[in-house]
A protein has these predicted regions:
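A short beta-loop-alpha structural element at the N-terminal edge
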Residues: 12-27
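A short helix-loop-beta-strand connector motif used in the catalytic cores of GNAT acetyltransferases and
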Residues: 53-67
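Conserved GNAT acetyl-CoA-binding A-motif
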Residues: 110, 116-129
Length: 164
């Protein structure tokens, strides 16, 4: 049985992605990232491999792809890369299926990720400078810009072990 990690009071939990869910996860990725045109993106300006089944399968095999669940419903996913010490985590990508947007699920997913890596004291991620939605989202969650480079804002959030 797969271990699940639940965010407090949210009902959402994450588990390592299951092989039979990859195609559904990729469909969600496509729908989620295609909504970026609504917040300043140009059509087709999506993350690398966002629509690749093979790449998502590889991420799952390597243990980086997590599926976000509410009860038995798959609502989104995350791709994360802990360092060898588990003290630092790079959040490569998160997405919530566009049919579930504007329900707080992105916040819940980030809470699940942070809860799933209790030894991590540093969380890092990046997002395009033009994307007002994601920049406001990460700042609202306590992430701070540490660098701007090549059209991307690089964010970091630190925490003291034992506090979330």
């Amino acid at each position: 049985m797969k271990e699940k990690v639940t965010a407090m009071k949210s009902g959402m939990y994450i588990v390592k992605a299951e092989e039979d869910q990859i195609e559904k996860i990729v469909d969600m990725s496509i729908r989620a990232f295609e909504t970026d045109v609504n917040v300043g993106g140009t059509k087709g300006d999506c993350p690398p491999e966002f629509d690749s089944i093979e790449w998502h399968k590889q991420m799952a095999r390597e243990g980086h792809l997590y599926q976000a669940m509410i009860e038995k419903d798959l609502v989104g996913a995350a791709i994360v890369f802990p360092d060898e010490t588990q003290r630092s985590l790079y959040i490569g990508r998160i997405f919530i299926d566009s049919v579930y947007h504007r329900k707080g699920y992105g916040i819940r997913l980030m809470e699940c990720i942070e809860s799933n890596f209790p030894c991590s004291t540093e969380f890092n991620l990046d997002t395009p400078c033009w994307n007002e939605r994601t920049n406001a989202f990460y700042q609202r969650l306590g992430y701070r810009i540490i660098k701007i480079e090549d059209g991307f804002n690089f964010y970091q959030k630190r925490r003291v072990i034992g506090r979330h």
